[in-house]
Design a protein with these regions (language model features):
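Conserved short histidine dyad/triad with adjacent acidic residue
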Residues: 20-26, 36-54, 157-175
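Short, conserved beta-strand element in jelly-roll/cupin
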Residues: 41-42, 52-69, 109, 159-161, ...
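A short, N-terminal "cap"/entry segment at the start of jelly-roll beta-barrel domains
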Residues: 1-34, 49, 101, 107-156, ...
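A short hydrophobic beta-strand segment most commonly corresponding to one strand
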Residues: 85, 99-116, 158, 210, ...
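Short acidic-glycine-tyrosine-enriched beta hairpin
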Residues: 72-88, 193-214
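Short beta-strand His + acidic residue motifs that chelate non-heme Fe in jelly-roll/DSBH
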Residues: 48-50, 69-70, 78, 86, ...
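Non-heme Fe(II)/2-oxoglutarate
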Residues: 234-256
Length: 256
């Protein structure tokens, strides 16, 4: 008589899933040249397969739930709005040990150099004035800034108070971006000049807009707070730190 224990089978229905990556935009589908993004959905009690981006660096941004990310023999715990920079060609896994389904945004850009992981805590950074830029009716939070080493990526959050608009409108010669809206409802325009302003859309939770170089890209909030991720690929600077006129609102438009 065999001593091997016989285990029961498992039925996996056609629509069952435990961990999934949703590709939201690639360069070929978004008119960008460096930047792509997607989302990870992780059910309770699930650990992902090993993940690896062989020619890209990445940043994870936790939108819902709480997860453990294992990278380079370290474990980082991410909860609401925490972020983690994943260096070029660095394996990692994501584990959801909580009862709630987790949602992470992942932004990626091609890279040549390999740096260290960098974890940023929303609880800490949202109170650290060195990480905050205060503008009229809105605050910008720098979660992955120039103080951290990366090839192309920078990222953070912007929170608009109700009935606020971007001012001044600005564009970039050396950066492309994606905005991913995480709370509230608003609107966004993207245009090269006023005469060709045809991209005007309402936005709500988890909508996103890609911003190729030289496009102005103002955002407008409505009757509630509007939160969004901004992720940059290209030259590493934040517009208000490079051009102080942006902070002062001295011009209607500016270019960096």
């Amino acid at each position: 008589m065999s001593s091997i224990q016989v285990e029961p089978a498992a039925l996996i229905k056609a629509d069952d899933w435990r961990f999934q990556y949703r590709q939201k935009s690639r360069c070929s589908s978004s008119n960008l040249t460096m930047l792509s993004y997607g989302t990870f959905d992780i059910k309770s009690g699930v650990t992902s397969d090993e993940l690896y981006h062989h020619n890209e660096e990445a940043i994870l941004l936790c939108i819902r739930g709480k997860v453990n990310v294992r990278v380079r023999l370290q474990t980082f715990t991410l909860s609401y709005y925490d972020t983690l920079f994943i260096p070029l060609a660095t394996p990692y896994t994501i584990e959801n040990t909580c009862t709630e389904q987790a949602l992470l945004v992942v932004c990626k850009a091609r890279a040549e150099n390999k740096y260290e992981p960098f974890y940023s805590s929303w609880e800490q950074f949202s109170r650290d004035e060195r990480r905050i830029r205060h503008l009229q009716g809105k605050d910008v939070f720098l979660m992955l800034d120039v103080t951290e080493k990366a090839d192309k990526l920078m990222a953070g959050y912007t929170i608009y108070q109700p009935y606020t608009r971007a001012w001044p409108a600005h564009n970039h010669t050396d950066q492309e971006e994606v905005y991913i809206f995480t709370k509230g409802r608003g609107a966004m325009e993207v245009y090269a000049d006023e005469e060709r302003k045809t991209f005007v859309h309402s936005v709500s939770e988890m909508d996103a807009v890609t911003i190729p170089v030289l496009n102005f890209h103002p955002v407008f909030s409505q009757s509630e707070q509007l939160h969004f991720i901004w992720c940059i690929a290209g030259q590493r600077y934040w517009v208000g730190d490079k051009n102080k006129d942006f902070m002062k609102g001295n011009s209607a438009e500016l270019t960096t």
